[in-house]
Amino acid sequence: MSEFNFISRLHNRGLISHITNEDNLSKLIENKSISLYCGFDPTEESLHIGHLLPLIMLKRFQIAGHRPIILIGGATSLIGDPSFKEKERVFNSNYNVNIWTEKITKQISCFLDFNCGKNSAVLLNNNTWFKQINILSFLRDVGKYFSVNTMINRAAVKQRITRPDQGISFTEFSYNLLQAYDFFILNQQYQVDLQIGGADQWGNISSGMHLIHRKTKRVVYGLTVPLLIQSNGIKFGKTESGTVWLDSNKTSPYKFYQFWMNIEDANVYYFLKLFTFIKVSEINKLEKNKNIKNQIINDKSLLAKHITQLVHGKEKLLAAERITKFLFLKNTTHIEESDLQQLKQDGIPFIEVSNVKDLQEALVLTSLAQSRTQAKNMIISNSISINTEKIRKNHIFHEKDKLFGKFTLLSRGKKQHSLLCW
């Protein structure tokens, strides 16, 4: 296989976890434009950064001349995928799923081009076909092609079946067949030859390939991207403060940007290959220089810039950079009111105040100090700043301390901050 073909380039970036019939798939996509799909169940009002790799993979295929199809699981989200889940999901209402579908559709739309000719992206909802099939038809036309023995032994559900305190309901157990039917319908109606997803979706993807082959004798393909786990064993995208969402109302662009700035050093160059479109040769050059002073920090910044702009756009990237300079480089020149609103949203701790008299009181209220005595000592020792300016004695707040008439930034040293909101 040529090292320059598309699949080889994906391997070179570390983007493939599983792939079926690799040689044939590689030949197929080198010789013609194919249709591929990835499904997203609206089980929350926003996608999170765990969804980024499949979305970016769809974008890579589209850039290479193929047609990406986004399948929103309006039907399957009412059931819930049990794959590698420790306990049964709580059922979502039709009302919530419909609202979440609208929000997630808007999020996904910014990743792909829906107006570029033959390989324009397509967005579908599997509720379209599931509302048209009855249970008897489904069992006869789909269920008969699956062995319960095989389904029970799939790794994705086996851990639940072997746990007497949990088990798995027939409802969740049937999810595998529903997703397989999605692949079958998309192959029949949209000529989809490839399904992609996270590594935890391998069992569901395999079932779809199995169903299509049994019913039509056609050969289709599956490909999964790596499931990223942090060194602490927690899934990538989870932090001490919760999930990192793609919706700017749930995770601000500043906090999103800072997430990437704070990844482990060992992952920087791997993530540049996974999440950006920078050439691998250029990333390798950066990695060779990683021991140069500040090089890794600069390369984290490069990663954060690329992904924040991809997800949130140029303007919100610039806002995240302004806030970063404001907090860490004491640059207040270009800070905007909306930037401080982002900080209040989830960037740093804040308190609402109206009649705080002096700095010592404010430091105690914000928990930057445990007592007025400690606050006094910190001020004397030159540890406290107001709006990035060092304060050397107790301070009575004035209107000039209120940025945009609303905000005052208190800092203890370089890393502890709190926002007074007047």
Swiss-Prot record:
- Per the Swiss-Prot or TrEMBL record, what residue ranges does the short sequence motif 'KMSKS' region cover? 235-239
Identify the EC number(s): 6.1.1.1
- SUPFAM superfamilies the UniProt entry points to: Alpha-L RNA-binding motif, Nucleotidylyl transferase
Q: Which GO terms describe its molecular function?
A: ATP binding; RNA binding; tyrosine-tRNA ligase activity
Chief location: cytoplasm
Domain S4 RNA-binding: from-to ranges: 357-414
What keywords does the record list, in alphabetical order? Aminoacyl-tRNA synthetase, ATP-binding, Cytoplasm, Ligase, Nucleotide-binding, Protein biosynthesis, RNA-binding
Query: Which sites bind L-tyrosine?
Result: 37, 175, 179
User: Which Gene Ontology cellular-component terms appear in the entry?
Assistant: cytosol
Residues that hold ATP according to the record: 238
**Reaction it catalyzes:** tRNA(Tyr) + L-tyrosine + ATP = L-tyrosyl-tRNA(Tyr) + AMP + diphosphate + H(+)
Q: Which InterPro entries match?
A: aa-tRNA-synth_Ic (IPR002305), Rossmann-like_a/b/a_fold (IPR014729), S4_RNA-bd_sf (IPR036986), SYY-like_C (IPR054608), Tyr-tRNA-ligase (IPR002307), Tyr-tRNA-ligase_bac-type (IPR024088), Tyr-tRNA-ligase_bac_1 (IPR024107)
Provide the assembly information.
Homodimer.
Record function comment: Catalyzes the attachment of tyrosine to tRNA(Tyr) in a two-step reaction: tyrosine is first activated by ATP to form Tyr-AMP and then transferred to the acceptor end of tRNA(Tyr).
Please give the name of this protein.
Answer: Tyrosine--tRNA ligase
Give the source species. Buchnera aphidicola subsp. Acyrthosiphon pisum (strain 5A)
